[in-house]
Design a protein with these regions (language model features):
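Interdomain motor-coupling "hinge/lid" segment immediately C-terminal to the ATP-binding subdomain
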Residues: 2, 9, 149, 157-271, ...
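Domain-level recognition of nuclease-like catalytic cores that cleave nucleotide substrates
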Residues: 203, 444-491
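Hydrophobic positions on the alpha1 helix immediately C-terminal to the Walker A/P-loop
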Residues: 64
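Hydrophobic anchor at the beta1->P-loop junction of P-loop NTPases
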Residues: 53
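Conserved lysine of the Walker
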Residues: 61
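A short, basic N-terminal segment
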Residues: 1-47, 488-491
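Accessory nucleic acid-recognition modules appended to NTPase machines
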Residues: 2-5, 81, 234-404
């Protein structure tokens, strides 16, 4: 006797797909960037690939799938040809994707007929990558969109088989631009195609007027820094509630459930200690050996856990950058949380972070990094940092691709200095490929372009709220362009 009878499976399928019985699923009207990107690929029949939405928990991936179902229905797609599966459901975790599909075809929609598969939390299905490969290769009538919140270490044959078969659409936390939209706030009156790099050609009066356009969103930027880019917390004005949601539904769920179920982690206490250690030292250079000693474990254990946290979309890793042909002798990485609000929630830091210069600097640096990573994603860049051991000069973030090198330094203080002795200028003097460099500041009065004698690179001091907003807006424009002209990177 089978553990699950067909009627047990069918009951779950009907529960997840209300449109089969002429009911509707309640979905919010706000569409994230990932919805627009994935829907373009879903409806383009010339692209024979699946779409994979990848990002942290609670950023709206499930909502995007239900919004896609709603869009399909509005276009006249037969309701029973749309199948949504939440693969972390207790019943569906007992099945392979093939078994769920078999019941769907036997009872709901015939095999061979066109269908749309919306697969949520696909990492919970055994060998999901091989199942998707087979479906994409041998079932051309199926259009597939999947989501995942954690990236398992894949076998070499699995990685090879995935190449060219699905398009990865990143789904990080909300950008500041999206944060304003989801809160239905008025957006600054600025050109939709304005990018940060365009500001190097603008006059000081233009920049002064631009800064004035952003005055009305300063309080929203502070709220964004405090509660982060998660849709549920963005819509709440209760800070304590927001932080509890982040601790319980994002951090604890990943550390105590996903890490056990997906990665087989047994010593959860060690992993939790490491995560708190990273919260306390966010943005600092991490010595694995020192960290292991302080936490009472081995360097190998710490290295393994760091990789898992990165795979679970909880941290960003920045490696040290080479410059001037000099190799980095001590390969020590920097780690940031993927959203500054996670740190606030875990360490119980409330509105006081907005008035503490040291705390606020870490929060701003994390937010700037999130926007840089998302904006440059399509170029598959290397995101690094630079520090010169002899002089202790440093640059917080360097984005590198074959076409550009962009150094970014965060100095969120009242009187940020920028001269030839500053780490940002020293780095630009060593790397002739740099054309533009940014210093992210606090005050509008600092907004402007600076030239330093003897350097070809130009420098832009730009307030953090303006920089992050323009990066988020430009990210939307890039994905719209990608949908028309080229595909994003493939896994």
């Amino acid at each position: 006797m089978r553990l699950l009878q067909p009627e047990d499976i069918l009951r779950v399928l009907y529960g997840f797909n209300p449109w089969w019985t002429n009911r509707t699923a309640a979905v919010p009207p706000f569409h994230r960037l990932a919805f627009d990107a994935s829907s373009r690929y879903l409806f383009d029949e010339s692209i024979r690939r699946g779409v994979l939405l990848a990002g942290p928990r609670r950023v709206g991936k499930t909502t995007v799938l239900y919004q896609l179902a709603e869009r399909l229905l509005s276009r006249g797609v037969p309701p029973r040809s749309i199948l949504y599966l939440s693969l972390d459901h207790p019943v569906l975790k007992l099945l392979t994707i093939d078994r769920s599909l078999a019941e769907y075809h036997d009872q709901v929609h015939p095999k061979g007929a066109p269908a749309f598969l919306l697969l949520d939390e696909v990492q919970y299905s055994d060998e999901w990558d091989l199942h998707l490969k087979f479906l994409i290769d041998h079932r051309p009538e199926l259009r597939i969109v999947a989501t995942k919140s954690a990236a398992l270490r894949q076998r070499r044959d699995s990685i090879d088989s995935g190449v060219g078969r699905w398009i990865t659409v990143p789904m990080p936390t909300l950008s500041f631009y999206e944060f304003l939209q989801i809160r239905c706030r008025s957006l600054p009156d600025v050109p939709r195609d304005l990018r940060p790099q365009d500001l190097f050609q603008k006059s000081r009066p233009y920049l002064a007027n631009l800064a004035q356009s952003f005055q009305g969103i300063l309080s929203e930027f502070q709220r964004y820094l405090l509660v982060g880019g998660f849709p549920e917390t963005a819509l709440s004005d209760e800070t304590d509630y927001c932080q509890r949601i982040l601790r319980e539904d994002v951090v604890e769920r990943v550390l105590k459930r996903d890490m056990v179920a997906l990665f087989g982690v047994r010593k959860i206490n060690e992993l939790e200690k490491l995560f708190i250690y990273l919260c306390l030292n966010s943005g600092g250079v991490l010595s694995v050996k020192t960290c292991a000693s302080e936490l009472g474990t081995t360097a190998a254990t710490i290295s393994g856990y760091l990789e898992l946290l990165e795979n679970a979309h909880l941290v960003y890793r920045l490696s040290p950058s080479e410059v001037g042909g000099k190799k980095v002798l001590r390969q020590q990485n920097k780690y940031y949380l993927t959203d500054a609000a996670l740190r606030n929630a875990v360490l119980l830091r409330g509105e006081e972070v907005l008035t503490d210069p040291d705390e606020l600097g870490k929060v701003i640096e994390t937010s700037v990094l999130r926007h840089l990573v998302a904006y440059h994603y399509l170029d598959i860049p290397k995101v690094a940092y630079w520090r010169e051991a002899r002089t202790n000069k440093e640059v917080d973030v360097i984005v590198k691709s074959p076409r550009y090198v962009i150094p970014v330094e965060v100095k969120y203080r009242k009187t940020p200095t920028l001269d030839a002795a500053d780490g940002l200028a020293v780095y630009c003097a060593k790397d002739p490929r740099v054309r533009y460099a940014y210093m992210v500041t606090r005050e509008d009065r600092d907004f402007g372009v600076t030239d330093i004698e003897g350097l070809q690179a130009r420098f832009l001091k730009i307030p953090a709220h303006i920089f992050t907003y323009l990066l988020g807006q430009a990210e939307h424009a890039l994905w719209e362009q990608a949908g028309r002209k080229r595909e994003p990177s493939v896994s």
